[in-house]
Amino acid sequence: MKSTRLERRAEKLQLSTGVTWTEALKCVKSLPPESRLIPEAHASQALLECYVLSGLAWPMVETRNPWGIRSVDARTGSITLTFENDVAQLVDSESMAKELVRALAPCFDEHGEVRGIPGARFTTDNDGIHIRRMGLLGSLTILGIPAEDWATALVLQRYENEGDGKRFCHDSHPHRWHRREAPFRQPTTRTALSRHHYRKKPSAWLASGLLRRAPLFRTIGVPLSTTAWTNLTDDGGSEWIIEYINETLADAPCYHQGFTNLLTDPECGLPVVGTHLDCSCDQPPESYWGCRFYARSTAGQPGALQVRFSRRCGDRASFYKDKLDDYEERRDLYEPVPTHLTRSRACMG
C-alpha cells in the first residue's frame, strides 16, 4: 500500500491512464492537492474524442489493450494516445495504423455519407501523428505508430476506398473543409446523415471520459476483447455500452469492484454515479453469466453508461489461448487493483 496521499493519488492515475509510475508521480506533484487527476475536456475537445472512440469502438483488427490504447495523457484541450503496434494480424495488410486511418481519416461516398472525423487533418513529425479539426479547438496526438506506417496505411486505405467508391476529403482539400464534410461542422437534424453527427454532441462528455480512462478496463481481468456501441436515450443523449471480455484472475467476492470504485472515484473517475449492478459473481466461474454496471451523470448531463463484464474461463477461454505467446502478453496487461482501493465500497445489487 502506498504510504502517502501523493503516492495514493499517483497510484490511481497510473491505473486509470496506463502511464508509468514515474510519469504518474511527476504529474501528481505538479497538481494542486485537491484537484482532479484527469481533467474534463472542453466541449470541442470532447467532441473530437467522441469521434475517436466511435471510430475505434468495434475494432476490425486484433488488439490486446482496450481499443489498442496502451496509455493516455489528457489535458483540457488535448489528448495524447499511445497505441500498441506489435499484435500479429490475421490479414497481412491489416495493422493498427490502418485501423486508425480507417476510423479517423474523413472520407465520403457517392451518397454524401462521411466516415471518420469531419474536418480532421493530419501532420506527422518526430513527436507523433497530430490530428486537428480545421478551425476548431482541440487536438489529438498519436504515439506508438511510426510515421512510415501511417503513410503506408493511407496508401492502402485509399486503394480500398477507390474500390468502394469513396474518397478521402483531404486529398483534394488538404487545408480547408471539403464541401461533403462541411455540413457536419455544425450539424443539424434536417437529414439522416446530419442527425448521425448531431447526436454525438450531447454525450460527448461521456465518450471523452471513457477514452481518457481506456486503460482502466485492464483492472477488471485479462483483456481478451473490448468492444463498444451506443443506443439513444430518452434525454437526447447516447448510452455507451462497453463489453469487456476478460479472464478473471482476482480472488475477490466481487472481482470488478475495484474498477467501479475507480470509475466513480472523485479524484480519478468519471462524473457519474452507479445506478444499478447486476452482479453474478456468486455464480460458478464456468457459468455463462456476466455482470453489468449501470451509471448516469452526477450533473444531469445527457446519456448513460453500461459496462458488461463478460467472463471467460475453462473451455470458454481456450479460444483465446491458441496462441500462447499472445495470451501471455495479455496476462501481463492485467492490472490488479490494490486491496485498499477495492474495499471502500460494497457491490451494488
Regions found by a protein language model. Give the residues of each.
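Compositionally biased accessory segments in Actinobacterial proteins
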Residues: M1-K12, S16-G349
